């Protein structure tokens, strides 16, 4: 769907109404025990024709999203250069009134600056219109203010930035108002400092981990000897989703301090990126929450039918928003050396892999887009 059409859909709360339990725009809070039992390792279906929705895109072991708040234009070139070198995409949560009112564009950026980042493949999301939250002498925003802060910020981004779909919010100061936010956003980032267990993501107030090795290794490996010490026992984080938050990287009163802070951030990001090919899916925030909610609500049925495998993949999410492909691992018949696939008659991305001598296909399929047929090349 074109950006303008999606933006129009998001401009009214009615677009986020759920009908008879289907076409959901976000999932409710997870039950106490989680939505499912998280597999401790990669899953390998045993019999030809069997299939499984991978926990993360590309069958990665875990997930990490790097987010940047508060506009911070002075860092844009630094982030663009580093992310391009490392082959990763980032998510900016933007305070939009600064752009609408052209407040201090040297720090807050202009729409042209955000378009530049979107054109490079990064995600531009909302940190509300004005970052208002209760603190010190500032009162809690009224419900009317919150509706405007959430709705108008998403609309401003979608009206001014193409090649991008603003559908997520980072709560100012981590102050959540999920009932109101759910009328406009598919997910919101909180700031409580723990990565997300894969089976228990609260999509309307996600956790926020840290960029240090302790947090990263707990999701990527399920264990760590790095600090903080308290995280070392949180085995439920294995295969989870770590959401990293940065503000101004080049912060400090003098050049030496600014350089030191930037070097520290660069080392953290480089370590995360070093795990991206197999252990981590380094995902834009909106891609991760689309994948997660599609996966959490998906139904998969597959069967071997003669010389082909067919499967259907459905979910409970709103189809014109939740369009990120899920990775479906399909056990192929013995002897297959390659595979190709179509969904609804159109070719889809397939990667052939083997495990313990058995052939598999990793098929990228979008829920509710038709039957998927897998055949040998």
Model-identified regions with their sequence ranges:
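N-terminal pre-catalytic segment of deacetylase/amide-hydrolase enzymes
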Residues: 21-65, 107, 285
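Boundary at the C-terminal end of the N-terminal hydrophobic targeting segment
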Residues: 17-20, 172
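Extended Gly/Ser/Thr-rich low-complexity repeat segments
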Residues: 319-337, 368-377
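Positively charged n-region of N-terminal signal peptides that target proteins for export
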Residues: 1-5
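Bacterial N-terminal signal peptides
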Residues: 7-17
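C-terminal beta-strand-rich structural cap/linker in extracellular carbohydrate-active enzymes
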Residues: 353-377
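C-terminal domain-boundary segment and adjacent tail
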Residues: 35-40, 44-50, 100, 158, ...
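Metal-dependent polysaccharide deacetylase catalytic core of the NodB/CE4 family, i.e.
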Residues: 25-36, 74, 84-186, 192-212, ...
């Amino acid at each position: 769907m074109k950006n303008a059409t999606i933006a129009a859909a998001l401009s009214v709360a009615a677009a986020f109404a759920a009908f008879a339990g289907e076409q959901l725009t976000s999932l409710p809070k997870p039950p106490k025990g989680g939505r499912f039992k998280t597999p401790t390792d990669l899953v390998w279906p045993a019999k030809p024709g069997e299939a499984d929705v991978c926990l993360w895109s590309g069958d990665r072991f875990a997930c990490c999203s790097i987010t940047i708040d508060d506009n911070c234009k002075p860092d844009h070139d630094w982030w663009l250069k580093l992310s391009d070198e490392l082959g990763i995409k980032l998510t900016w949560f933007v305070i939009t009134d600064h752009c609408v009112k052209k407040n201090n564009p040297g720090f807050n950026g202009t729409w042209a600056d955000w378009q530049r980042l979107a054109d490079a493949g990064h995600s531009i999301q909302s940190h509300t219109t004005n970052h208002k939250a209760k603190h010190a002498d500032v009162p809690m925003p009224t419900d009317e203010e919150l509706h405007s802060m959430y709705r108008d910020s998403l609309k401003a981004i979608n009206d001014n930035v193409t090649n991008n779909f603003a559908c997520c919010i980072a709560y100012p100061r981590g102050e959540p108002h999920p009932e109101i936010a759910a009328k406009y956003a598919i997910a919101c980032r909180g700031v409580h400092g723990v990565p997300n267990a894969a089976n228990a993501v609260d999509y309307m107030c996600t956790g926020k981990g840290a960029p240090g090795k302790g947090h990263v290794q707990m999701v990527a490996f399920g264990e760590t000897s790095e600090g903080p010490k308290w995280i070392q026992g949180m085995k439920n984080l294995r295969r989870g989703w770590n959401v990293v938050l940065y503000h101004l990287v080049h912060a400090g009163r003098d050049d030496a301090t600014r350089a030191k802070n930037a070097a520290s951030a660069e080392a953290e990001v480089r370590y995360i990126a070093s795990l991206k090919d197999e252990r981590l899916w380094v995902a834009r925030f909106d891609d991760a929450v689309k994948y997660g909610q599609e996966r959490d609500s998906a139904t998969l049925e597959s069967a071997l039918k003669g010389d082909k495998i067919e499967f259907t993949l459905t979910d409970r999410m709103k189809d014109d928003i939740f369009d990120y492909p899920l990775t479906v691992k399909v056990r192929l018949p013995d002897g297959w050396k390659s595979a190709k696939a179509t969904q609804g008659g159109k070719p889809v991305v397939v990667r052939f892999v083997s495990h313990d001598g058995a052939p598999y296909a990793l098929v990228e399929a979008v829920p509710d887009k038709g039957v998927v047929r897998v055949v040998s090349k």
